[in-house]
């Protein structure tokens, strides 16, 4: 009450902003006579003048009045349309990063030209975001004439365009495209292996058309790129046939004396950590076997750059054969390997071991080897659009969602007054007892309108409901057209003609958005056809166009006299905003119009929220069948129900965003690191830091900091340095031959040895050649580990709500454990990259260059790539649902904290999946 009282005295914030902006409108209007006197060339020259002023540091706000006046004048000359004052207000709201709510027919597309032109002067790019490809193409061509006239370039970003064309589109001053395509381009740019392959030029300023549809309706579902990595099915089978030729070594060897081995062999097993290590003899045996089967060249090493991937498959095959046993670790069911939880004995259907182990077990058992489909990259619209330096949006219906726009995106909603006051009559809802009665009443209304010639738009909430109306109208013999929001270009033509006298058009709520319904029909397409007809003389063209427009004026006045466009809806949507969008199709630019909702007590929304209450009223009034209840209290109770649903949906979206923000922070780190690697000319400092960290982590496992010599485990350290890092060091001899040596000196010796071995490789082929190889190794490892990390996060997210039963806050638990998973990801990248670079054997620059190219082509050879995007309703189409690759996470709790983790990572359980338990 007090708030309303103060608003009446001081005005709302919306009123105060409009008052402030109207002062600028006066300034813009004052410039109009001056710009009218300028020639075309003088107008174009203004653009260059503005660009130079911005480049010198002048703010866009200081140029705004002159720039808006220039665009208005250009539009008058090229488009034959003059911006209304309210469109100038809308343009200012968009420039200042707000959401402009402008009713249907108020000219949002033309309004956007003002801030688009102004912000394009900075040279940093402007992205105009539309809901479908048709609108992107239409608006780019339509408004592109104006931008080109003013000296700016325009690009269109469409799906399946060649990379060069996309790059050209993004290099333009202004780029038009769909929300999905901008998001997918961002993800693809963070999957490239060459800096010059990126298409986007930065995220400066975006104007989102139909902002409510994109940032709210489609915000529940992320954009997902998924696919299958390179197909190695034949290689898994071959490795399974070769590993029986390798013999297990028995006994533990002393690295100094060689004693302790009871039988020499090719590999040793560490059953506790589920790891396999090749011996020196094993490397020679593997090289001989690979050469005999044509997998490597005669005399080549398994650690040559081109052959390094073979070792990955060999280790997977050895682990599958010797460490994973049927009916203990897995069972075979229906031609599939199903993992057994070794603590509970339960089958873990749908889970798959990672790093090629599952495929190796499939090859061992002779079942079909399944190519694993993984999420390669993913982002929500909420997090993508928040990456822009400045974001704005426009729609006909945003005020009902103003709180969500402010809360999630930090966007203020500003209601722009119409150019002419609305004359639409929004009638009270009619509520019937049954659906049958509801449809019968709606059809009677449609027939009455058709008989008097009044055009009707029938709105439905689903394709199923539109088909019911279609059948009923066909039975009545009423001619009509049906739209279902799939064929955007055709729909735009039909919707444009829905205002003709006697027309009946059935449309789902989303169909034909972005196209005005003009009373009497739209003649612009016919006018364009006449203008394009070269067979006609100039005079004939003018005469035909004049006759066409005169005929349209007669039709227009006729339909206005009949009451304008009639909106008939057969169900309330769960969002008031969608209902308002439907109503907004009628009564554009001060035209007459009317709307009515026909409801049944068994409609979903009524049944759940308001059915019992309204039914009780009907029963008390003893209303006969076929009679409707029409009362303000009913309409208000329905709107109250809609508010409840909207609040619930907002809570869902906000909760999803809070979880996704965790992944988003990690995504930013990974993508930033990836871009730095792509752009860096020298990676030696990064690699050196990673190598030192790895050596420190390894040494500190066996030679703890500030520890006594008696606590050191030098034999195991020597063994691991030799088998995993190809570093042979006599650390025990060093200690025995020295009077006193500290743990830090041991660490320094290992670091120096690792640096010397690494520098020798670099010197052999040259720093420049080795840098490109380092880049490929880093990028490939980042991508592989990030894909596995996305799967791990998805698995963590699925079960995190159960923590609530343990009196823990699931959201906080998710943040904590996701951070730990991310730390492990960074550690794995560090270890894998360093290990590969330390063990690879290079002979020549040519060999290294070829290896880098092979790695790049392998990394990019993703099969069955699927692009999953939200549909118009914010739901994922079932046919495009991503099949997430999943990591093995044991669910038992009886493993010892200091035992090796059963997942096979080699880490202690408390440092690995024990953190997830």
UniProtKB/Swiss-Prot annotation:
SUPFAM superfamilies found in the cross-reference section: Helical scaffold and wing domains of SecA, P-loop containing nucleoside triphosphate hydrolases, Pre-protein crosslinking domain of SecA
Cofactor notes: May bind 1 zinc ion per subunit.
Keyword Magnesium belongs to the record: no
Known cofactor(s): Zn(2+)
Keyword Chloroplast in annotation: no
Membrane topology according to the record: Peripheral membrane protein
PROSITE patterns per the UniProt record, alphabetical: SECA (PS01312), SECA_MOTOR_DEAD (PS51196)
Keywords: ATP-binding, Cell inner membrane, Cell membrane, Cytoplasm, Membrane, Metal-binding, Nucleotide-binding, Protein transport, Translocase, Translocation, Transport, Zinc
Gene3D superfamilies attached to this UniProt entry: Helical scaffold and wing domains of SecA, P-loop containing nucleotide triphosphate hydrolases, SecA, preprotein cross-linking domain
Cellular compartment(s): Cell inner membrane; Cytoplasm
Pfam families: P-loop_SecA, SEC-C, SecA_DEAD, SecA_PP_bind, SecA_SW
Residues binding Zn(2+), per UniProt: 901, 903, 912-913
EC class name: translocase
GO cellular component, one term: plasma membrane
Principal location class: membrane
Coiled coil, from the record: none
Function as written in the Swiss-Prot or TrEMBL entry: Part of the Sec protein translocase complex. Interacts with the SecYEG preprotein conducting channel. Has a central role in coupling the hydrolysis of ATP to the transfer of proteins into and across the cell membrane, serving both as a receptor for the preprotein-SecB complex and as an ATP-driven molecular motor driving the stepwise translocation of polypeptide chains across the membrane.
UniProt similarity note: Belongs to the SecA family.
Listed HAMAP family: SecA (MF_01382)
Identification of the protein by name: Protein translocase subunit SecA
Organism: Verminephrobacter eiseniae (strain EF01-2)
Gene that produces this protein: secA
């Amino acid at each position: 009450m007090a708030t309303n009282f103060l608003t009446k005295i001081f005005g709302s914030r919306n009123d105060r902003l409009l008052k402030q902006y109207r002062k600028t409108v006066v300034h813009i209007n004052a410039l109009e006579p001056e710009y009218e006197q300028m020639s075309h060339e003088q107008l174009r020259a203004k653009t260059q003048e503005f660009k130079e002023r911005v480049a010198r540091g002048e703010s866009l706000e200081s140029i705004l009045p002159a720039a808006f006046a220039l665009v208005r004048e250009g539009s008058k000359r090229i488009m034959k349309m003059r911006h209304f004052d309210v469109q100038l207000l809308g343009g200012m709201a968009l420039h200042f990063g707000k959401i402009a709510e402008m009713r249907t027919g108020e000219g949002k597309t033309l309004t956007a030209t003002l801030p688009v032109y102004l912000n394009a002067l900075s040279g940093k790019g402007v992205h105009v975001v539309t809901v479908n490809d048709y609108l992107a193409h239409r608006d780019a061509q339509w408004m592109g004439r104006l931008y080109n006239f003013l000296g700016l370039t325009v690009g269109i970003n469409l799906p399946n365009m060649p990379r060069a064309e996309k790059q050209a589109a993004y290099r333009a001053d202004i780029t038009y495209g769909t929300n999905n395509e901008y998001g997918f381009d961002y993800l693809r740019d963070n999957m490239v292996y060459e800096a010059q392959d990126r298409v986007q030029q930065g995220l400066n300023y975006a104007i989102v058309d139909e902002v409510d549809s994109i940032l709210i309706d489609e915000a529940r579902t992320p954009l997902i790129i998924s696919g299958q990595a390179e197909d190695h099915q034949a290689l898994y089978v071959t490795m399974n046939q070769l590993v029986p030729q390798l013999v297990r070594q028995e006994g533990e060897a002393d690295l100094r004396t060689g004693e302790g081995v009871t039988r020499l062999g090719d590999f040793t097993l560490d059953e506790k950590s589920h790891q396999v290590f090749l011996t020196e003899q094993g490397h020679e045996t593997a090289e001989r076997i690979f050469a005999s089967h044509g997998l490597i060249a005669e005399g080549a090493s398994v650690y040559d750059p081109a052959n390094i991937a073979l070792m990955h498959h060999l280790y997977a095959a050895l682990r599958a054969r010797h460490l994973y046993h049927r009916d203990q670790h897995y069972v075979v069911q229906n031609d599939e390997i199903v993992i057994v939880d070794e603590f509970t004995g339960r089958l873990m259907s749908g889970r798959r071991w990672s790093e090629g182990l599952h495929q190796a077990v499939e090859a061992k058992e002779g079942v079909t080897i399944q190519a694993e489909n993984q999420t390669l990259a993913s982002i929500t619209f909420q997090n993508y659009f928040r990456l822009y330096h400045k974001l704005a949006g426009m729609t006909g219906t945003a005020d009902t969602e103003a709180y969500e726009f402010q809360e999630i995106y930090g966007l203020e909603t500003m209601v722009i007054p119409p150019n002419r006051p609305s004359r639409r009559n929004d009638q009270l809802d009619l509520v019937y007892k049954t659906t049958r009665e509801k449809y019968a009443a709606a059809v009677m209304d449609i027939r009455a309108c058709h008989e008097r010639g009044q055009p009707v738009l029938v709105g439905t909430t689903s394709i199923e409901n539109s088909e019911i109306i279609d059948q009923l109208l066909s039975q009545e013999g009423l001619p009509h057209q049906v739209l279902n929001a799939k064929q955007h270009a055709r729909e735009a033509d039909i919707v444009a003609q829905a205002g003709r006298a006697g027309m009946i058009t059935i449309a789902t709520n989303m169909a034909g958005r972005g196209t005005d319904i003009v009373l009497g029909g739209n003649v612009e397409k016919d006018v364009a056809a006449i203008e394009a007809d070269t067979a006609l003389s100039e005079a004939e063209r003018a005469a035909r166009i004049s006759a066409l427009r005169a005929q349209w004026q007669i039709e227009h006045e006729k339909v206005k006299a009949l009451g304008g466009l009639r909106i008939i809806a057969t169900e309330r949507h769960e969002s008031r905003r969608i209902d308002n969008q439907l109503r907004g199709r009628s009564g554009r630019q001060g035209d007459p119009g009317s709307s009515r909702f026909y409801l049944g007590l068994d409609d979903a929304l009524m049944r759940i929220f308001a059915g019992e209450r309204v039914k009780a009223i009907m029963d008390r009034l003893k209303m006969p069948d076929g009679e409707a209840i029409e009362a303000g209290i009913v309409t208000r109770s329905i709107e109250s129900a809609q508010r409840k649903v909207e609040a619930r949906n907002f809570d869902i979206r906000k909760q999803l965003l809070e979880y996704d923000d965790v992944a988003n922070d990690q995504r930013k780190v990974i993508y930033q690191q990836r871009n730095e690697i792509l752009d860096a000319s020298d990676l030696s400092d990064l690699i050196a830091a990673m190598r030192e960290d790895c050596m420190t982590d390894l040494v500190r496992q066996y030679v703890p900091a500030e520890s006594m010599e008696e606590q050191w485990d030098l034999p195991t350290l020597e063994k691991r340095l030799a088998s995993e890092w190809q570093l042979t060091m006599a650390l025990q001899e060093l200690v025995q031959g020295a009077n006193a040596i500290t743990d830090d000196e041991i660490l320094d010796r290992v670091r120096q040895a690792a640096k010397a071995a690494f520098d020798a490789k670099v010197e052999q082929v040259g720093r420049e050649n080795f840098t490109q190889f380092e880049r490929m190794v880093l990028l490939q490892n980042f991508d592989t580990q990030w894909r596995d990390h996305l799967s791990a996060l998805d698995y963590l997210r699925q079960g995190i709500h159960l923590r609530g039963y343990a009196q823990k806050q699931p959201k906080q638990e998710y943040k904590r454990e996701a951070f730990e998973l991310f730390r492990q990801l960074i550690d794995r990248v560090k270890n894998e990259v360093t290990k590969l670079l330390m063990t690879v054997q290079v002979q020549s620059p040519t060999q290294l260059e070829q290896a880098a190219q092979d790695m790049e082509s392998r990394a990019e050879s993703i099969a069955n790539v699927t692009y999953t995007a939200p549909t118009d309703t914010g739901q994922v189409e079932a046919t495009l649902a991503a099949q997430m690759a999943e990591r093995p996470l044991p669910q038992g709790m009886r493993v010892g904290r200091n035992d090796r983790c059963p997942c096979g990572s080699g880490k202690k359980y408390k440092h690995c999946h024990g953190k997830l338990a």
